[in-house]
Amino acid sequence: MDQTYSLESFLNHVQKRDPNQTEFAQAVREVMTTLWPFLEQNPKYRQMSLLERLVEPERVIQFRVVWVDDRNQVQVNRAWRVQFSSAIGPYKGGMRFHPSVNLSILKFLGFEQTFKNALTTLPMGGGKGGSDFDPKGKS
C-alpha cells in the first residue's frame, strides 16, 4: 500500500480485504483513529509498513471440533486460533466459547490482546482462540 495514504483510505483498505468482518474493522477503526496523529508526525513507522503488519494476523488456524453430546448425537463446531503478533514474545490470549463466535470476533479480540499484552511490558505477543460451541447446559 502507498505510504502517503490517509486514515480513511487505510481503513477502506482493511474493510475491502475482509468485507464481512465488521467487528474486526470497527476495532481497527478505533485504534487507528487514536494512533493516526502520532503516525503522521513519525512517518518512519509508516515507511516500515507497521500499520499493514499490525492489522494482518501472522497466522489463522481454522478447524472443526467433532464431539458426541449427552444424547449420543455427533455434533460439529467450528473453531479458530488467531495468532496476531509474536513481535515481542509468544502468542498469549484466551479462548471464547459462544454460538456467536466467528473469525471477525476473534480477529478483533486478538488485535486488542496484542496491545493489552504489550502494555504489560512482559514479552508476550497477542492471539485469541475460540469456537461457536455453546457450553451452557453441557456436561
What is each residue range found by the language model?
Residues 1-139:
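N-terminal ligand-binding/catalytic initiation module
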